[in-house]
Amino acid sequence: QVEWETEMEIIEIGKGRMVCEGDDIAILSIGHIGNYVTKAIKKLNKEKIFPSHYDMRFVKPIDQELLHKILKKYKFILTVEDGCVMGGFGSAVLEFMAENNYTNSVQRLGIPDRIVEHGSQDELYSECYYDDEAIYDFCNKMLDHQGSKYEELVI
């Protein structure tokens, strides 16, 4: 596992990084929402679920080399962004998949396509269902995707 908070370093434009390696599902995040992913992963690890976490860092240019590696390795992909889901990071991942004929199961978390009221970050993340609890829930439901509970979570 890579330390999430590190000293300043030069970041290559268009290159993401693996934050922690697992086998069950890949969680791709962009920006500070990755801190919530880290919290969710700690909870999932206690239940013997070991997701990989990738900090993609850039939407444009998106790290195509890293996406190829991720999509070849994992059946289940969860994208998490503190931005609009429609036309955002998750959409960029889906476009990349379509252009390259990938058929992985993908769920996108972020701000839904509706008006969101005011509140603290934690309140809004919870209301929009992309806080650490939502990330935890979606990982569980995607891995148990044949159950009816998965359909209830799809936004």
Language model region names:
Residues Q1-I155:
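Thiamine diphosphate
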